[in-house]
Amino acid sequence: MWKEFREFAMKGNVVDLAVGVIIGAAFGGIVSSMVADIIMPIVGAVTGGLDFSNYFLPLSESVNASNLSDAKKQGAVLAWGNFLTLTLNFLIVAFVLFMVIKGMNRLKRKDEAASAEPPKPTREEELLTEIRDLLKAKV
């Protein structure tokens, strides 16, 4: 049983998936930083210095805080600014993954086209070709 599990775990797909998950987690941190530290401040500057992460809609009258963390302590809020930031984060990740996959597919097609040379004829095919040529020569 251990041998079967080891063979399964060492197959290319499982190892590739594990590497992909680890790289994806690291990449997620980079994208989150890009959205929070680069894109959203630019969007905030264009819209007059607004910080979208603190945009919320209070769902009870007891909420009167000016920032999201204090408002959550006071009661229920709809944190639509945070949702907007996370949606932008997702769109950036999806676009980057799309571009990576598109590039990989392009390279794969080039490799397939380069290695698409016809296969070498088998010994049987060579013998049949010789027989055909001999028969043609007699006619």
From Swiss-Prot:
Q: What does this protein do?
A: Channel that opens in response to stretch forces in the membrane lipid bilayer. May participate in the regulation of osmotic pressure changes within the cell.
Q: Which domain of life is it from?
A: Bacteria
Q: Name one Pfam family in it.
A: MscL
For this protein's source organism, the top of the classification is:
Bacteria, Pseudomonadati, Pseudomonadota, Alphaproteobacteria, Hyphomicrobiales
**Predominant subcellular localization, coarse grouping:** membrane
Q: How does it sit in the membrane?
A: Multi-pass membrane protein
Provide the protein name: Large-conductance mechanosensitive channel
Q: Which InterPro entries match?
A: Mechanosensitive_channel_CS (IPR019823), MS_channel (IPR001185), MSC/AndL (IPR037673), MscL_channel (IPR036019)
**What subunit structure does UniProt give?**
Homopentamer.
Q: What are the TM regions of this chain, as residue ranges?
A: 19-39, 40-60, 81-101
Q: Which cysteines are joined by disulfide bonds?
A: none
